[in-house]
Amino acid sequence: MATQMVKGNTAVIIGAMYAGCDCYFGYPITPASEILHEASRYFPMVGRKFVQAESEEAAINMVYGAAAAGHRVMTASSGPGISLKQEGISFLAGAELPAVIVDVMRAGPGLGNIGPEQGDYNQIVKGGGHGNYRNMVLAPSSVQEMCDLTMEAFELADKYRNPVVVLTDAVLGQMAEPLRFPEEAVEHRPDTSWAVCGNRETMKNLVTSIFLDFDELEEFNFYLQEKYARIEENEVRYEEYLVDDAEIVMVAYGISSRVARSAVETARAEGINVGLLRPITLFPFPSDRIRELADGGCRFISVEMSSGQMREDIRMASGCRDVELVNRMGGNLIELRDVLEKIREVAGDSSD
C-alpha cells in the first residue's frame, strides 16, 4: 500500500478517483480550489470528464445532469460558493439523485475571509436549500479521512440516491499528512435502471423534482422522511476516546476534535475523567449515544469553530440538558488552553 505526503484537498480527489467518480464540475474558490485543480490535472488523464464551469450555479446543475445520466459525479466549494449551490442541491435531493459535494468551510458570514471555521454546520446538516430534505453529512478529521470518507460518500450517495456532503474546513484542506492510498479502486456498477442514459431501455424514465399535484408532493415528502429515518437507523458513525469512565464528554468534529483529543490527554494527566465523542456523521447525528451518556450522568462540552450550532443538537440529544461551549470564530483556531480551562471549570462545578 503506497503512502505519500499530500494535502487534504488533494486527498479528496484521490478518494474520488479510487471511488470511480467519472465527472467533476466546479468553480474555483479559496480554500477549496486545489480540489478543482487536481481534478483538472488527473481526470482527463484517465478519460474522465472535467469542466470548470462559468459559475457555481452552472457547476451544480452540471452535477444534476451527470447524476441523472447515472454517472458518479462530484463538486466542491466553500462558503459563498456553497450558498450559490443550495438550489441545485435541493433539486438533487428532490429528484433523488446521488452526488457528492465537498464543503471546505471558511469564515463568514458574507465574504468573511479564507480562514477556517465550522459555521456552515446548520446550512449543511439541516439541508440549507428549500424544502423538506436532508443531506447525508460526513466529517473527516484527518487527511486520511479526507480520502476515505470521500470514497464512502459515493457509496452512500448511490445506496440512498441522495446528496452526500463531505464537510471539512480550511485547515484540513490545506494541511499535509501521510496518506495511505486505497488498496484497490472501486468498479462502479450501481443499479442505474432509474437513470436517463440516452438509450431505449431508459426512454421511459423521468428524473424530476416537480409535482403539480399537492397530494402527490405530500406523499413524496413523507416518503423522503421515511428514507431519512432509515439513514438515521443504519448509518450513524462516531468515534469515542476514553469515554467509558468519563464524567465529562466533549463533542467535537473536524479539526476541532484534534484539539479536543489533546485536551483529553492533558486533563486525564491531571486526574479529570474526561472523554471525547467525535461524530463522523453529522447527519445522521449520534443522538442515541449522547442520550445514553447523558442518562448516565455525563456532562457535555461542545468544542466547535462556530457560534455553537452543533451545541443545539447535543442539547436536544441529551434531553435539553445544559451543554457548555468552547468556540472560536472569524478564522481563529480553538487553542488547547481554552479547552482545558473549560474542562477544569466544569470539573470544579461537578465536585462542588
UniProtKB/Swiss-Prot annotation:
Gene3D superfamilies named in the record: 3.40.50.920, 3.40.50.970
Catalysed reactions, as listed in the record: 3-methyl-2-oxobutanoate + 2 oxidized [2Fe-2S]-[ferredoxin] + CoA = 2-methylpropanoyl-CoA + 2 reduced [2Fe-2S]-[ferredoxin] + CO2 + H(+)
Record-linked Pfam families: PFOR_II (PF17147), POR_N (PF01855)
Keywords: Oxidoreductase
The keyword 4Fe-4S appears for this protein: no
UniProt keyword Nucleus, yes or no: no
GO term, biological process aspect, one: sulfur compound biosynthetic process
Molecular function (Gene Ontology), one example: 3-methyl-2-oxobutanoate dehydrogenase (ferredoxin) activity
Enzyme type, top EC level: oxidoreductase
EC number per UniProt: 1.2.7.7
Subunit-level organization: Heterotrimer of the VorA, VorB and VorC subunits.
Protein name: Ketoisovalerate oxidoreductase subunit VorB
